[in-house]
Design a protein with these regions (language model features):
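Rossmann-like dinucleotide/flavin-binding elements
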Residues: 1-26, 127
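Flexible, glycine-rich terminal cap/loop adjacent to redox cofactors
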Residues: 15-18, 29, 34-45, 50-161
C-alpha cells in the first residue's frame, strides 16, 4: 500500500505542475499485521511521541467497552490515540478488524482533524468503529473535569439561579 501511495504521487507530480504537485506524507502511512489479534498503527508510537514532543497525552478505549465486540465475542483489545497539543500524532489498535478501524485515524491525521471533529461524526450502532467515538467521549468527559470548565459552569449556574 505504501508503494501504491508513492506511485500515485509520482504520477501526479509528473503530469502536473506547481501548485498541484504533492509531497509524500509518511506520517500518515498506516500499517497492519493480520495476526490474532490484529494490530494496526499510524503515526508515532507513544515512545516516539514522547521523544519528539516531550509532553503528550494518550487516550485509550478497550474493546470490552464496545457492544459490537461483545456481540462478536471478541472483547480483547484496545484503541489508543496519542495527542500533542490536541493534535492526533499517532494511533494504535489491537483487536478485531484493527486493520480496517485504523483508517478513521489516518483520515483525521491527513486532514488535521481533531478528536472533537471525529467525535462529531455519526457512527452506526453497534459497530466496532464506535471505539473511535468512545475515545472522543473520554476526552470530552476529561475536559469537563478541568478547573477552567468547572469554574465556568459554576458561574453559569450561579447566573441562572
Amino acid at each position: 500500500h505504501t508503494a501504491d501511495y508513492e506511485a500515485q504521487i509520482v504520477l501526479q507530480n509528473c503530469f502536473l505542475f506547481y501548485p498541484f504537485t504533492r509531497k509524500i506524507d509518511f506520517r500518515v502511512v498506516p500499517w497492519a499485521t493480520f495476526t490474532e489479534p490484529e494490530v494496526a498503527r499510524v503515526g508515532l508510537t507513544e515512545r516516539e511521541a514522547r521523544e519528539k514532543f516531550g509532553k503528550i497525552k494518550t487516550i485509550k478505549a478497550a474493546f470490552d467497552e464496545n457492544d459490537r465486540a461483545h456481540a462478536e465475542g471478541e472483547t480483547a483489545g484496545f484503541a489508543k490515540i496519542i495527542l500533542h497539543k490536541k493534535k492526533i500524532v499517532g494511533a494504535s489498535i489491537v483487536g478485531l478488524r484493527a486493520g480496517e478501524l485504523i483508517h478513521e485515524f489516518v483520515l483525521a491525521m491527513r486532514h488535521n482533524l481533531s478528536l472533537a471533529d471525529l467525535n462529531k461524526a455519526i457512527h452506526v450502532y453497534p459497530t466496532l468503529s464506535k471505539i473511535t467515538q468512545a475515545i472522543g467521549t473520554k476526552q470530552t468527559l476529561e475536559n469537563l473535569k478541568s478547573p477552567f470548565t468547572q469554574k465556568w459552569f459554576a458561574r453559569y449556574l450561579k447566573f441562572w439561579h
